[in-house]
Amino acid sequence: MSWNNLHPGLVMILFGFIILALPEKCRKYLTLAGAVCAFCSFWMMDSHSTLPYKVTDNLTLQLIDTNGVSMVFLMVFVTIGVINAIYAMDLQNKWEAGITCIYAGSNMGIVLAGDLLSFIVFWEISAFASTYIIYAR
């Protein structure tokens, strides 16, 4: 895997799980760091990036398959993620911050999905995270 194929959605999901595992005082900086890292990985991608992941001999997941339209939508989602991280630095608790990062990352994964199975997996992660965010209030 080269650096121009670093998945911004998986970066945000990873930071979301790290936020959930670490103490509360690390939350605000990790939320912003995750969004900035996802933004940087977006800028390293080109409009023809691919990231296949071979599960078995017969099954290969296409985690990244970009074109011009997906890059525009990804730019919107990454920018919203950074703005959300800046806005929410003092408003959320640890669980809301972690799940919000997971939600943002799964939405980026939906945009970048190159096959139906990857799309459905990221969609279900997004559905779980959004349900938690709604019922957390």
Where are these regions (language model features)?
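Transmembrane helix-loop-helix hairpins at membrane boundaries of multipass inner-membrane proteins
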Residues: M1-G98
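Alpha-helical multi-pass transmembrane bundles of energy-transducing inner-membrane proteins
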Residues: G98-R137
